């Protein structure tokens, strides 16, 4: 069975989708069979992989509503060796439509059970909120959550609330829910604040912070507009190298050997 991680943070703009896409791309690059699940009605992960969110034949909305199993809606990118269960703006209505349904919090987990044997890793990209969609993502996180945290002061404010939500999900729905790790993003070592944030996050989640820190990177910000992860857009950039290192760190921590693979092709887009 695959390792299933949910990327979650109710604060927007912390690099959650960026981390989901680029971590997934590098896990695939290192030989893992990866499924990325877009659970956000904004469908940014879908768009960032070059998929038109308005023209998909179905995605997480249809899966959660029981209109379709997941398998026929999964898209595979042969170039990236990465699979995607896409999202669309229609997903915004799912929380209202599911409000009176039984077992509504476990819909995603049950839907993924049928396709799970096909993959080594499933990464679930949640919306920046703590509603029913995110609860579905948390309950499906068989191997824990990955929490991206921007290295800025305001990013710290929501950590306490997120911790409370995780505790509530453990108590009511999924006692085994754990934190796989915290990823520090948009790090600028030139500022004292960034280093202060690192120290504060380590207080909240002792021994859970990934060693790899994701720097601020123009190339990371540009890549989605080209519909590709940074590994395909600017593989020699600092951001690309950081996500490659994060993927290796995750694999190592999961007891998966990292194969020797050729370096990504050089790109003119470097930092």
Where would I find each of the regions flagged by the language model?
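P-loop NTP-binding core
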Residues: 1-271
């Amino acid at each position: 069975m695959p390792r299933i991680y949910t990327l979650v943070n109710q604060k927007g703009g912390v690099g959650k989708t960026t981390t989901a896409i680029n971590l997934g791309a590098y896990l695939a690059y290192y030989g893992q069979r990866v499924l990325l699940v877009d659970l956000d009605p904004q469908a940014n992960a879908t768009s960032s992989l070059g998929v038109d969110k308005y023209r998909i034949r179905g995605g997480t909305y249809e899966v959660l509503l029981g209109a379709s199993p997941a398998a026929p809606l999964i898209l595979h990118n042969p170039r990236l060796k990465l699979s995607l269960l896409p999202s669309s703006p229609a997903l915004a209505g799912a929380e209202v439509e599911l409000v009176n349904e039984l077992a509504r919090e476990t819909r995603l987990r049950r839907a993924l059970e049928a396709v799970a044997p096909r993959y080594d890793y499933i990464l679930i990209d949640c919306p920046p909120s703590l509603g029913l969609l995110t609860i579905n993502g948390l309950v499906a996180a068989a191997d824990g959550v990955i929490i991206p945290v921007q290295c800025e002061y305001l990013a710290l404010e929501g950590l306490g609330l997120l911790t409370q939500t995780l505790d509530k999900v453990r108590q009511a729905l999924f006692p085994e829910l754990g934190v796989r790790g915290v990823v520090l993003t948009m790090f600028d070592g030139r500022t004292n604040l960034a280093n202060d944030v690192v120290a504060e996050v380590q207080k909240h989640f002792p021994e859970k912070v990934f060693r790899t820190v994701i720097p601020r990177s123009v190339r990371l910000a540009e890549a989605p507009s080209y519909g590709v992860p940074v590994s395909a857009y600017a593989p020699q950039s600092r951001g690309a190298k950081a996500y490659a290192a994060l993927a290796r760190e995750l694999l190592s921590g999961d007891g998966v050997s990292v194969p020797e693979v050729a370096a990504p092709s050089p790109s003119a887009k470097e930092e």
